[in-house]
Amino acid sequence: MVRIPRRKLLPSCLCMTATVFLMVTVQVLVELGKFERKKFKNSDLQDGQKDVEGDPKHLNPLPKKDALALSGRNKVDAGSYPIVLWWSPLTGETGRLGQCGADACFFTINRTFQHHPMTKAFLFYGTDFNIDSLPLPRKAHHDWALFHEESPKNNYKLFHKPVITLFNHTATFSRHSDLPLTTQYLESVEVLKSLRYLVPLQSKNNLRQKLAPLVYVQSDCDPPSDRDSYVRELMAYIEVDSYGECLQNKHLPQQLKNPASMDADAFYRVLAQYKFILAFENAVCDDYITEKFWRPLKLGVVPVYYGSPTIADWLPSNRSAILVSEFSHPRELASFIRRLDYDDGLYETYVEWKLKGEISNQRLLTALREREWGVQDINQDNYIDTFECMVCRRVWANRRLQEQGLPPKQWKADVSHLHCPEPTLFAFSSPASPALRGRSLRELWLPSFQQSKKEAQALRWLVDRNQNFSSEEFWALVFKDSF
């Protein structure tokens, strides 16, 4: 059976995916078709469900590990292999016996296996995790595992202690996760060092006659990070070319306006002409680092970064990015960027690591060297395969302990596996874009985050009761004054 990894597909890819899904079942085609179109069809310029930062184009389309397709969806001999059930239909696999080193597990999205005696673990995709249907009652030997590499705005309740601690195993953007995905948008050390897109400084200086020093490309406006408010204020002090729908003042060439072109060589070369790229995440979370940060580094452009408070731990060198958090106001940031724009020697200190091909950050080098998955590498498993195998191996480890008469090991996630503070506005924030019909960011994201706390508490109470529940029960509990 063909291994179908999850990716945010563009319309042309959707057709190919749909064809493969038809080989599985019509039911899976409909279900996944809705799932993909809802969450993954949009622009590389957009965030969360719309953005390339949640776009795992780096998934390996041809998994490395062995997979044995089973002819019958339910033909698994009880007592033979542990069953690992994707409760979120992420992979589209109705049945696959996957080899994970010396261990093997049966992976499936078929929910009829929920009560099978050999079902040992349930896998959830964070964005798709909801209260409408959960595998309850949960038996003592049922592990829950969470895969969530995307923005917190996709599902805030996961980021609160009552919910994250429901899971035994995690794969998230946090370095503290069981399977850290912090470098999910960075292919390799070699890509960082590559000079393929580097435009010489003298050429950039000449291009400054028609280009601003800074470029901003976003089409998901007014996200929880309040980035558009900051950039809007920054524009009052320094020129910024903005190509996306947010604060747009410049247009891309017609052939690059299609979202499919956002990973195109021609688009990269447009960005590479600039001295600085505004690399602002859609949310502020520890270790939540997307292509917005890595892309300018690949292109030989200095990122002006706002997002993860822990970004300093992941810089290629101490002087490779300008951190917005180090400036008290956009006015000060603009003044500093103008200094670098006019002083070639000072500017070059920020690209010296690139020119010399020297990455001094040992944490980054170690993370890339030791991670068990690859990005756009046909010789390595993708991170979904690796996540599945991590759970499979842990299931087998406990099975062996029990065979020896020993108690099974208990794994449990904690709040460090997904940490994001509540959204905050910049002091100079102005009303949101017309797209939000006059609502401010505070009116949208902060109440959403605060309500998610109550949702997390309600969900935990219902899950601990260990009975199926309706959405009506859940929402009644969320809005109960005394809860």
Curated annotation (Swiss-Prot):
It is an enzyme of class 2 (transferase). Disulfide bonds join 389-392. GO terms for molecular function: alpha-(1->3)-fucosyltransferase activity; fucosyltransferase activity; peptide-O-fucosyltransferase activity. Pfam families: Glyco_tran_10_N, Glyco_transf_10. One of its GO terms (biological process) is oligosaccharide biosynthetic process. Its EC number is 2.4.1.221, 2.4.1.-. It catalyses: L-threonyl-[protein] + GDP-beta-L-fucose = 3-O-(alpha-L-fucosyl)-L-threonyl-[protein] + GDP + H(+); L-seryl-[protein] + GDP-beta-L-fucose = 3-O-(alpha-L-fucosyl)-L-seryl-[protein] + GDP + H(+). Residues 45-64 are annotated as: Disordered. Keywords: Disulfide bond, Endoplasmic reticulum, Glycoprotein, Glycosyltransferase, Membrane, Signal-anchor, Transferase, Transmembrane, Transmembrane helix. It is found in: Endoplasmic reticulum membrane. This is GDP-fucose protein O-fucosyltransferase 3. It comes from Rattus norvegicus (Rat).
